[in-house]
């Protein structure tokens, strides 16, 4: 092998990988209607998971769970959600969890432990840490701010 063979092989492999990436990305563009159907199905499954109490039984929802339900790989579902919404599938799930938590925190009859269990957290401290990281305040602070303004 001469001194140019290695660089030629590398260049050809790079071209092949670029073609692979091109075709992979193109499928998200050319299948827009089907992608929207998958996204709607993902949202429906996520709503059903949170509303049915499955989170308290099975834990925090995962991308893998929903990908299996939709018959896609977790990576493909993640890429599809990212291309359609700009958010990763995990961020999408977390956003839904935060919205459910915010609605639950407005109800004075639910304490933080109950809300944490409802969302699938095994420990209220994990929920409080998650909530503060996502929202910027603790669940108690959020509740106090929103009860005061209601």
Pin down the residues of each PLM region:
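Residues within the alpha-helical elements of helix-turn-helix
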Residues: 69, 118-119, 134
């Amino acid at each position: 092998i001469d001194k140019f063979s290695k660089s030629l092989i590398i260049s050809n492999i790079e071209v092949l990988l670029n073609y692979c990436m091109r075709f992979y990305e193109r499928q998200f563009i050319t299948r827009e209607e089907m992608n929207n159907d998958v996204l709607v199905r993902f949202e429906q499954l996520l709503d059903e998971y949170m509303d049915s109490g499955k989170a308290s039984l099975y834990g925090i929802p995962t991308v893998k769970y929903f990908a299996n339900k939709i018959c896609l790989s977790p990576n493909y579902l993640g890429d599809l959600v990212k291309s359609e919404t700009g958010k990763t599938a995990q961020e999408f799930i977390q956003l839904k969890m935060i919205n459910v938590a915010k609605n639950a925190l407005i109800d004075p009859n639910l304490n933080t432990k109950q809300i944490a269990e409802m969302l699938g957290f095994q420990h209220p401290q994990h929920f409080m840490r998650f909530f503060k990281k996502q929202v910027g305040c603790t669940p108690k602070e959020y509740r106090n701010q929103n009860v005061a303004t209601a």
